[in-house]
Amino acid sequence: MPLRLLLLLLWLWGLSLQRAETDSEGQTTGELYQRWERYGWECQNTLEATEPPSGLACNGSFDMYACWNYTAANTTARVSCPWYLPWYRQVAAGFVFRQCGSDGQWGSWRDHTQCENPEKNGAFQDQKLILERLQVVYTVGYSLSLATLLLALLILSLFRRLHCTRNYIHMNLFTSFMLRAGAILTRDQLLPPLGPYTGNQTPTLWNQALAACRTAQILTQYCVGANYTWLLVEGVYLHHLLVVVRRSEKGHFRCYLLLGWGAPALFVIPWVIVRYLYENTQCWERNEVKAIWWIIRTPILITILINFLIFIRILGILVSKLRTRQMRCPDYRLRLARSTLTLMPLLGVHEVVFAPVTEEQAEGSLRFAKLAFEIFLSSFQGFLVSVLYCFINKEVQSEIRRLRLSLQEQCPRPHLGQAPRAVPLSSAPQEAAIRNALPSGMLHVPGDEVLESYC
């Protein structure tokens, strides 16, 4: 028995050696750490034996990934891929790049794409293709939204009869959508392209544009936050119209302005401070420390949840109103469906679908499904809102019709020597709708003005 046991132990030991030889690249965590630690020691010894240059230069250092020698200011350093990588044999000919600034300080940017695991390149290329297509989609969506929102904002601003609290809130919402679209499109122009960087000029340009890129990132976060808060203002105001019997809008609009434009600063400013202190890397477009990202994400999720609850509450009110008025609205189910679809983009209800799915949970197909859903609807949301609440709005169409009739009266076109027949302004078919488009504080029956717009 002892001999058999000894032979078994020798066989297992030989098998382990064979596996270690055949799988030399499959290092354990402990082995990888030891190789990384030895690489750092060798780097430190090399730097101590090297005499620093006399001119302005970046100090030699080990940045926890690669060993950087002393480098002259305003140049790009290049070192071979670190040999402690498990796949070093496949990337031995690759290099890591880092920019030394004109002030003799290392830039936060580092390009190690040539040293990445080649086995992941295929999956990376597929993901890159999907992300590039999604970028094209939201670029088209935000550009279209930007154009239509600008036109809608001009229309609501020019016609004085459309000036009321409801449309003032719409105008601020349109502005927030425009700022969001403009900030995202501008940020994309300042961010580096997807995938590996080519050439030695890219780090220099990227380092020079770093401040502008981070500024654009901060403005983007503020504009996105303002967009969500103005969606919340729309929900709060609509709920106020339907529920509160005695309502006075004096002073309320100032509170709405403070909430819409002031609330985002309450979480964007702390995010900027914490990000600068604890994760001041690249253009701040990546959120490696999730706790910092939740400073912005938590208030946005709260606004989404509140708006969804308001949406459910409003639907309940509309159902009860429409059921009590079946004599006037016999097709109330169809009108309820139309009302629901109309309210969804105004309140951003679509955000609830993937709101419970966090960034940590979204992996693989779920991640791309979440990205595609949110990117498509969010980029075209401004376009839908401008169409639903401006271009096909009866009050807006009536004002445009009045303007056209007024212009026709000022510039008559005689036909066959016959004087043109004057058309009174009051003959417009939607004149009654305009007379009813008064500030909501003058309407004494709660919910009637909203219900009439759906019936």
UniProtKB/Swiss-Prot annotation:
Any one annotated GO CC term: plasma membrane
Residues in the Cytoplasmic compartment per record: 159-166, 240-251, 317-338, 396-455
Tissue expression as described in the entry: Present in the pancreas as well as the gut, adipose tissue, heart, pituitary, and inner layers of the adrenal cortex, whereas it is not found in kidney, spleen, or liver. It is also expressed in several brain regions, including the cerebral cortex, hippocampus, and olfactory bulb.
PROSITE patterns referenced in this protein's UniProt entry, alphabetically: G_PROTEIN_RECEP_F2_1, G_PROTEIN_RECEP_F2_2, G_PROTEIN_RECEP_F2_3, G_PROTEIN_RECEP_F2_4
Signal peptide: 1-18
Record-linked Gene3D superfamilies: GPCR, family 2, extracellular hormone receptor domain, Rhodopsin 7-helix transmembrane proteins
InterPro entries, alphabetized: GPCR_2, GPCR_2-like_7TM, GPCR_2_extracell_dom_sf, GPCR_2_extracellular_dom, GPCR_2_GIP_rcpt, GPCR_2_secretin-like, GPCR_2_secretin-like_CS
Subunit composition and interactions: May form homodimers and heterodimers with GLP1R.
PANTHER family: GASTRIC INHIBITORY POLYPEPTIDE RECEPTOR, PDF RECEPTOR-LIKE PROTEIN-RELATED
Purpose: This is a receptor for GIP. The activity of this receptor is mediated by G proteins which activate adenylyl cyclase.
Name the UniProt record assigns to this protein: Gastric inhibitory polypeptide receptor
Species this protein is from: Rattus norvegicus (Rat)
The organism's taxonomic lineage, starting at the top: Eukaryota, Metazoa, Chordata, Craniata, Vertebrata
